[in-house]
């Protein structure tokens, strides 16, 4: 196997033929970071979105900035941005990339909050993992901020859940 992730069929004896398509393992199956050094720099953008289901009373408290712990959305925004900036430290084999912009947008519904995180970079690899980390961490921060309001009498969270986290946009364009 060439280790270039191109799946050229030159696997060593006994190697898994499907392993030729794996870009995060070397010839012996050990984890490795993909070499992006020869790729050209491009302008890249990724957007991820997710939702946290909450009791309607909790959403109202967030909307009215009446949660005991403080401003839920401001805190979640900071958490999302911090997560974007530190993705390379938490996702194995993820490159540290120069983040040029992060936008967060919260949409409060009747029984939940949707968070959209847009990340931009100029570099050799994409930023969708950063957008996903921002969305999931931002939603986790919302949960942390409102958990006392969401707990039932047994200390459980029967109406609370994070769902539908997905990449909704991924673009790249040559630098001008």
Question: What annotation goes with each model-predicted range?
Answer:
Residues 2-68, 73, 78-81, 85-95, ...:
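C-terminal binding/interaction regions
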